[in-house]
Every structure is written in C-alpha cells, then in structure tokens.
Curated annotation (Swiss-Prot):
GO terms for biological process: autophagy of mitochondrion; glycophagy; nucleophagy; pexophagy; protein localization to phagophore assembly site; protein transport. It is a peripheral membrane protein. Keywords: Cytoplasmic vesicle, Membrane, Protein transport, Repeat, Transport, Vacuole, WD repeat. Gene3D superfamilies: YVTN repeat-like/Quinoprotein amine dehydrogenase. This is SVP1-like protein 2.
Length: 317
C-alpha cells in the first residue's frame, strides 16, 4: 500500500491466485479499478511504492518505474538471489541486495549513482530504511548481528547483537523518530535497540556499551575486560518481549506466499504506530496481531510490555 493513499500493489499467490505470480497490479481502491499492470518473465517477489516510483523485486533483479499510467521503466539492477524480495525505498535512496551475497546496493534516486555496502559475509535476511532515509539496518542469515549504516556515505555506525545463537530474522523496523530499532526472529522474541543517527554525535559500540542508562550492561564488568570475546562487549537490546508464533505448521494444505522461504505463513512483521507503540503481526490460519508498549519503570529504565492481542481470523482478545 502506498502510505495512506488508495493505491494497493497486488500480486497473485496462494492455492487459487486471482492473478499470475509474474503479474503486478496497481489497484485504485477509490475508483475500484486496476490503473497499472506490469508483467515480468519470472515471479514478482517484492514491491515497493512511493508517490513517484514503483520498485519490483524479482529473484535476480530489481526493476524501477515511474509511477504513472502507463508506467515508464527507469532502470534494471542485477542482484544475487533474492528469494525474499528484499528492497527498501525512500524519498532519496533505494537499497536492495548486491550482486554478491551479503552486499547491499544503495542507489541515489536523483543521480542514479550506485554505492556498494559489504554488509555481511552471508546472504541478507532482512533490511530496513529509516523514515528519513538516512539510516539503513541489515541482518543476514546468521541472525546474530544487525548492522547499521549511514546512507549518506555508507559508513557502518554500529553493530547490534540480537543474541549469540543462530536465528531467522523475521522483520526489522525503525521508529518514526528514527531513534529506535525493533527486531523479531524465530526465537519468538521482540528486541528493541537504541539506534545511532548521523545527525547525532559520533557513535561507537564502546560508547553505547559504557552508557550510564544501563541499556547495554548485560554482562556487567565482563564487558570491560580486555581480550574477552566480543560477545561480552557488544551492544544488546535495552528491552525485549515474547511474541506468539502461532500453532500452525507447514503442510500440504498451505501454499507459502511469494517472498517467503520458510514454508509457513509470515510471522513477526513489525509496525510502529508511534515511538512507544509496536505492532507485531503474523498471518496464516492462526493469524494474530499483538500490541507492545515501551514504558519506564520507577528507576527510569524502559521495558517492553505486551498490552493486547487479537486473532484477526478467529476468536481472541
């Protein structure tokens, strides 16, 4: 969906798709009709919309168009295998996987200049662009670290540690103020991190881990002992909470949607309604949404608390 407008991007999927999987339809809900149709040789895995552009992710390429009727093709970029259809579209930049696993291509929309960010050594699993377009967060298939980059110069600003064991990252999302990052994974945990920003003072893992707010004091004095493994000094989330994965399992009755590789409905999709409220949505027969809020305790430390939930395809509360 394009912001809060009446335009919806639709791609066929499921057991009985209305549209073929290689066809993108832009639907005008106000006029109740199709206004743009695009067809490709392979399945559409991801779509991003802005007021001026349509971005389509295929398995090995990214296609950009002017948002007009008829649409005008602007560019095609080659990528490594991108089965999740990863792409982030801002007002000034477009980010998507590079030609090598773990790399990010960052395109400046006004000039078309392309920069390469060597973000990870393993394939990308998730990406998120801040609302102001100045910060890019990435995670790989390893699922232990989230790396933060400034889009203005592609510099790495921080590494945030989700955990020490392997995990499948479901979703990354940056808050409306550009100051917080939420992360979900198959560990059924929602993590919330403070996020560095280029407009603020220079940021480093050492500064974050020694901050006075206690956010990163997971290991206490161990984090300050030289030569210990970096896991003791890395930046951890300041708050976390459990979310529900649901009870359904992959099976012959479920047709996984395009852009997923888990053989099960998408889970843990994050949305911020404001800087203190996070929604986590899961689909499938056990589809539900959960609402989490960030609150300060008596000592001023923030906690992530589940305030409510509902099964939107069944009964719940």
């Amino acid at each position: 969906m394009l912001g809060q407008s009446n335009y919806l991007a639709l791609v066929g999927g499921g057991r009985q798709p209305k549209f073929p999987q290689n066809k993108l339809v832009i639907w005008d809900d106000a006029k109740q009709k199709v206004v743009i149709t695009l067809e490709f040789r392979t399945s559409v895995l991801g779509v991003r919309l802005s007021k001026s552009r349509i971005v389509v992710a295929l398995l090995n390429s990214i296609h950009t168009f002017v948002f007009s009727s008829p649409p005008k093709k602007l560019a095609v970029f080659e990528t490594t295998d991108n089965p999740l259809g990863l792409a982030c579209l801002g007002q000034k930049v477009l980010a998507f996987p590079g030609r090598s696993p773990g790399q990010v291509q960052l395109v400046e929309l006004e000039t078309g200049n392309v920069s390469i960010i060597p973000a990870h050594s393993t394939p990308l699993r998730a990406m998120a662009l801040s609302p102001d377009g100045e910060v890019l967060a990435t995670a790989s298939e390893a699922g232990t670290l989230v790396r933060i980059f400034a889009t203005s110069n592609c510099a790495k600003m921080a590494e945030l540690r989700r955990g020490v064991d392997h995990a499948i990252i479901f979703s990354l999302a940056i808050s409306p103020s550009n100051n917080l990052l939420a992360v979900t994974s198959d560990k059924s945990t929602l993590h919330v991190f403070n996020l560095p920003h280029p407009r603020n003072a220079p940021y480093s893992n050492q500064q974050a881990s020694s901050s006075d707010d206690g956010v990163n004091k997971k290991w206490g004095i161990l984090g300050k002992i030289p030569l210990l493994p970096r896991v003791f000094s890395d930046v951890y989330s300041f708050a976390s909470a459990h979310f529900e994965l649901g009870e359904e399992e992959p099976g012959p009755t479920y047709a996984p949607p395009l852009g997923t590789v888990l053989g099960r409905p998408p889970k843990g999709v994050i949305g911020w309604s404001n800087d203190n409220t996070i929604l986590v949505v899961g689909s499938g027969s056990d589809g539900r949404w959960e609402k989490f809020v960030l609150r300060d305790d008596e000592e001023g430390k923030k906690h992530c608390i589940r305030e409510g939930w509902k099964k939107y395809l069944g009964s719940g509360s």
